[in-house]
Amino acid sequence: MSKFVKFEAQIDGYLPELSVKVDNILMVTIDDVYFTQGGKLRGRRTQDWNDYSTWNFECITSQIEELSTDEWIDLSVVDSENKTKRFFIREDSFVGLDSENGYYKLMVEHNGVNLSYEVRGLTRKGAREVVETFED
């Protein structure tokens, strides 16, 4: 149950596009865009996206919000460095949250297999908010 999320970012009046196939999680921070594809977490620093170095955080997240359906849960948490992390997670794929070596891990199911993704900087309060959102 993948979906394509298309981003647009205005660069000097030009609107380049990038389509990303998202399986379970899409995470956007002020510096990075992460997404799951084929059961693996992919991460790219913004400046590595060819001509996308001037991507706007608010622009990206607002477009994802418009494209997200009821099947996706939008989480917004603030990490220990006071940076906002936005998670867009398929509701039916969320398994839970785990903690290992001081880092939290989001656990999701992908094709019948449980996978976990480390979320660096996620505070205890932020982790609690994630769990509470899925318990509602």
Task: State where each predicted segment sits.
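Acidic, Ser/Thr- and proline-rich intrinsically disordered linker/docking segments
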Residues: 2-17, 23-136
